[in-house]
């Protein structure tokens, strides 16, 4: 079957967010290794680095986003770019199909579940579409029921019910719901409905997950969306760390890690989207300083509200922090997590980061920002028991305590042991004969027959 894939081209269209671009390009690599030619259509905003992927064809389309719109929240940005990009995308895809040679047939489009117009466009051009979901399958399965949960009367949550489970959405707790929905409210409902409806009309659903992490949820996904489901993750496990980052990575942090003792460093990163207040920033700084544990802290420029970078830190606090740690603007995360010196990860629990931490066997301290991160963190702390949940308390004493428990105490050792077991299970999934390895072959043959 593999020889037949030569001469077939797959079109990929990532959503222009760091957490969506990386998985799409990793998927492109997976398919390219299996004989498919790759074309990536992308927006001007957050354009991927074509030079890092010389074997792929990159086609840029205008997105019409103003600087003001780029600074808006993720939901506003998604709404605007879905409006602006439809016509340019249609024109670009039509041109690719018209110019495709008989010797290299375009077989399908694979795009992110957050694009709402691509199913209609692909149908109008008679091109099969597959959906890539960069969330945990358990979370995506809840898309049809999230509007019902929002109106169920769980919010606002009383103190006595805060730790109660959400019956329709275990292991989520009622206190998590306000951060799942954020300020979106009912604005979210039409978006969720459109995602579900276009996924049901697609030719397949791809997850960067595996049966070892959520077998029952993957089975349920097939029942909910009524399309073939391919769990082929974790994507990054198939290749060495790639340079798909939209941010400039500070490689000096690897040299700094080289000088640290094994499993002694707590790595701190809240991802590419989460923002915190100046007060929260200072609490994290003091908690890390007081823990006396070596740390590598990623502070993304603009991530502290009202500040360009680390200006809120006093000179005295900077000196105290520099005694034990290193602060950078962005880090090569996969390399950091794989480094022998890294012993823990204080994370926002985006699905990419959670998977990367599991694959490298690094236990977590959970500080989710919102949306799917709330569910991911509950699985880490309550189901898999491979991390400690801060329960939203960004307080120096809580952060110091969590770091000490994870890095120094017996409970941290138990967490580390459970993490090793899960790491080994997930590792098997991507090896020959593993569930994800087999699912990739099934996906490749599915694309061949479209």
Swiss-Prot record:
Involved in the N-glucosylation of cytokinins. Catalyzes the formation of both the 7-N and the 9-N-glucosides. Its EC number is 2.4.1.-. Belongs to the UDP-glycosyltransferase family. Optimum pH is 7.0. Keywords: Glycosyltransferase, Transferase. Inhibited by olomoucine and 3-isobutyl-1-methylxanthine. The gene is UGT76C2. GO terms for molecular function: cytokinin 7-beta-glucosyltransferase activity; cytokinin 9-beta-glucosyltransferase activity. UDP-alpha-D-glucose binds at residues 272, 331-333, 348-356, 370-373. It is an enzyme of class 2 (transferase). InterPro entries: UDP_glucos_trans (IPR002213). GO terms for biological process: abscisic acid-activated signaling pathway involved in stomatal movement; cellular response to water deprivation; cytokinin metabolic process; regulation of anthocyanin catabolic process; seed development. This is UDP-glycosyltransferase 76C2. Gene3D superfamilies: Glycogen Phosphorylase B (3.40.50.2000). Signal peptide: none annotated. It holds the Pfam family UDPGT.
